[in-house]
Each structure stands twice: as C-alpha cells, then as structure tokens.
C-alpha cells in the first residue's frame, strides 16, 4: 500500500442521490462535532463571558464566585443548552456550507484549486476530506461560510451570552427571549452581529488558511516515517494538532472583535455600535479591555476547533470510503 492510499479520498460517482446523502452527512457530522465540543468546553466559554463583561473581573475570583453559588460546580455549565444549540447547529451549517463552497469552487474551472503535487508536497497525500484550494480560496470560503452560519444562529448566540452573564437574572431561556423581545424588539436578538461578523469572517478565513497549511507541513513530516501504519495512526493527530495551532493563531488575531461583541450583546443600549463600543472600552478600561478573556478564548478555541475538525474529518473520511465501496 502506498502512502497516498492512506490519506486519499475515494472518488465517488456523482449522482443526485449521492449528493443529497453526502450533504446530509456533512450536516450530521458537523452537528455531532459541534455538540461534543460545546458540552465539554462550556465552563471555559462561561468564564470567558464573565471575564469579558468587565475589565475588573479576574479569573480566579470569578471561578470561586461561581463554585460558591447555590449551584456549585454545576454553575460552570450554566447556559449549556443555548451553547450546545448554537455550536452544534452552527457547526452543522458551517461545515455544510464550507463543503458546498469548496466543492463548487473546485469544479468551476477557476484557478483556485491546488494541483495534487502542490497540495500534497512530494508525494504526500492529504489527511483532509475537503477539496484542496489555494490560500486565497481557503480564506474566502472559510469567511463566507462562517458569516452565513453566524447570522442564522445569532438569536441563539445573544440568548447564550445574556444567560451566561451575571448582569441578568434570567431564570430560563424562555424568560430571556421574552424580555429581549419586549424591551428591544427583534433587533435585540441580533445585537452585536456587526462585531460578530467582523470577528468570525477573519477568524474563520485565517483558521482554514492556517489549518490547511499546517496539515500539509505535518503530513510532509509524517511521510518521512516508517510505513503506512504509522501514517494511519498519525492522520487524526495531524488534524488535531493542526486544528489547535490554527485556532490559537486566528484567535489571538481576532480577540478584540470578540471582546467588543460581548459588550455589545450584554449592554447594547450603552455601547450602541462597534466603533462606539471600542472608544468606550478603551476610555473606561484601557486597551487591555480589548484583550479580555484572551487566554480563556485561546484555550477553548484551540480545544474546541481541534476536537470539532478532527471528529468531522474522521467521520467524513469514513463515509467517503463507505460510499466508494457501495458504488
């Protein structure tokens, strides 16, 4: 067996039934990967929200305050339902859209797809289930897919942030949604979308760009190993490490947008819009306020992205092999 046989994605005969089933499976794989990462990493997400809501909020006192509350340790998982819905269905929409965009670009004839040689290096096949695109195409497809998914899931995101925050004493998600609609109208459910899009578009674009580049480099190193079995076992490792590193880099670059987004969603009447929020945050809390929650966000994003993408790619690769043998 050659090295390329380990990573190569089987060619599946294009039929309408196959296209439909593959789209459904991309959605299901994205949902599964998103749900698993959201539930496991909810404490980090909740702590990030609490730290970002005020520059004076330190991590350790925040943890002690939550644990000493009546709910105890369970308080760290407050907001898990909206977080799981947002991340689960958001990931499902994102991966489905990303696959559709990449498949579409790869078959348009536009020079955005890498050749087999340039994509894989010297005989190294890819551990990815997605088509190989150029750097600019990776950037564009990642950004477009994330913004589209973010817009659809925005109401759930606002509910999640409000419910996790200590600013509001919502007893349930229903009461949170009812209060937002009563006091702010439908617009309130989309508070902070501008900052979210400004964060998500570059983040997702940079993530896909870094992720694909890192995978090619790590695959080149794995190719110098000793045989096919070592390559098989390293496929998931390549995806996981690449995902964690790519998320860390993209998160560090885009964290100011995340800090602004959180303030806008918590106090839309005070901050108004993205530019006003930046000015007020810097004036009241200093430039450091734009880096609030960076450590927590890097930790959570690195783990969640690595987990989500590894689970997603492994499920898709297994499905591709199944479809190939069936056809």
Curated annotation (Swiss-Prot):
One of its GO terms (biological process) is glycine import into mitochondrion. PANTHER family: MITOCHONDRIAL GLYCINE TRANSPORTER. It is a multi-pass membrane protein. It comes from the Eukaryota. Belongs to the mitochondrial carrier (TC 2.A.29) family. SLC25A38 subfamily. Mitochondrial glycine transporter that imports glycine into the mitochondrial matrix. Plays an important role in providing glycine for the first enzymatic step in heme biosynthesis, the condensation of glycine with succinyl-CoA to produce 5-aminolevulinate (ALA) in the mitochondrial matrix. This is Mitochondrial glycine transporter. It holds the Pfam family Mito_carr. One of its GO terms (cellular component) is mitochondrial inner membrane. Gene3D superfamilies: Mitochondrial carrier domain. Solcar repeats lie at residues 21-104, 136-217, 234-318. Keywords: Membrane, Mitochondrion, Mitochondrion inner membrane, Repeat, Transmembrane, Transmembrane helix, Transport. The chain crosses the membrane at residues 27-52, 79-105, 139-164, 192-215, 238-264, 293-311. It catalyses: glycine(in) = glycine(out). GO terms for molecular function: glycine transmembrane transporter activity. It is found in: Mitochondrion inner membrane. PROSITE patterns: SOLCAR.
């Amino acid at each position: 067996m050659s090295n390329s046989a380990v990573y190569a994605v089987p060619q599946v005969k294009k039929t309408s039934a196959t296209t439909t089933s593959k789209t459904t499976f991309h959605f299901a794989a994205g949902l599964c990967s998103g749900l698993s990462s959201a539930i496991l990493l909810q404490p980090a997400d909740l702590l990030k929200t609490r730290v970002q809501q005020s520059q004076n909020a330190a991590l350790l006192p925040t943890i002690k305050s939550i644990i000493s509350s009546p709910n105890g340790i369970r308080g760290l998982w407050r907001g898990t339902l909206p977080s799981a819905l947002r991340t689960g269905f958001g990931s499902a929409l994102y991966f489905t859209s990303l696959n559709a965009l990449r498949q579409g670009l790869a078959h348009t004839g536009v020079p955005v797809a890498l050749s087999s040689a340039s994509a894989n290096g010297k005989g190294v096949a890819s551990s990815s289930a997605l088509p190989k695109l150029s750097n600019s195409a990776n950037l564009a497809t990642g950004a477009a897919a994330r913004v589209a998914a973010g817009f659809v899931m925005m109401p759930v995101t606002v509910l999640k942030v409000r419910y996790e925050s200590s600013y509001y004493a919502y007893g349930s998600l229903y009461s949170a949604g009812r209060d937002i609609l009563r006091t702010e109208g439908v617009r309130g459910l989309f508070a902070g979308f501008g900052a979210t899009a400004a964060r998500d578009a570059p983040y997702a674009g940079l993530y896909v760009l870094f992720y694909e580049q890192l995978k090619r480099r790590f695959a080149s190193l794995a190719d110098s190993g000793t045989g096919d079995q070592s390559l098989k076992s390293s496929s998931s490792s390549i995806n996981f490490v690449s995902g964690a590193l790519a998320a860390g880099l993209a998160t560090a670059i885009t964290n100011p947008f995340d800090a602004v987004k959180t303030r806008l969603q918590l106090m839309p009447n005070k901050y108004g819009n993205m530019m006003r929020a930046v000015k007020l945050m810097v004036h009241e809390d200093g430039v450091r306020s734009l880096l609030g929650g960076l450590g927590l966000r890097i930790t959570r994003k690195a783990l969640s992205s690595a987990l989500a993408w590894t689970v997603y790619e492994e499920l898709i690769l297994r499905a591709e092999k199944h479809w190939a043998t069936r056809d």
